[in-house]
UniProtKB/Swiss-Prot annotation:
GO terms for cellular component: chloroplast thylakoid membrane; cytochrome b6f complex. The 4 large subunits of the cytochrome b6-f complex are cytochrome b6, subunit IV (17 kDa polypeptide, PetD), cytochrome f and the Rieske protein, while the 4 small subunits are PetG, PetL, PetM and PetN. The complex functions as a dimer. It is a single-pass membrane protein. It comes from the Eukaryota. It is found in: Plastid, Chloroplast thylakoid membrane. GO terms for biological process: photosynthesis. It comes from Chlorokybus atmophyticus. InterPro entries: Cyt_b6/f_cplx_su6. Component of the cytochrome b6-f complex, which mediates electron transfer between photosystem II (PSII) and photosystem I (PSI), cyclic electron flow around PSI, and state transitions. PetL is important for photoautotrophic growth as well as for electron transfer efficiency and stability of the cytochrome b6-f complex. This is Cytochrome b6-f complex subunit 6. GO terms for molecular function: electron transporter, transferring electrons within cytochrome b6/f complex of photosystem II activity. The gene is petL. The chain crosses the membrane at residues 5-25. Keywords: Chloroplast, Electron transport, Membrane, Photosynthesis, Plastid, Thylakoid, Transmembrane, Transmembrane helix, Transport.
Length: 31
């Protein structure tokens, strides 16, 4: 169970990082 929570945390962190990077690049392109 602890392993599943850790894996889920890593997955959410990676998804959040990708989303922030995508939004940043898109904002730069709009400017």
């Amino acid at each position: 169970m602890f392993t599943a929570i850790s894996y889920l945390g890593i997955l959410v962190g990676a998804l959040l990082f990708v989303t922030i990077t995508f939004l940043t690049l898109r904002t730069i392109q709009l400017l």
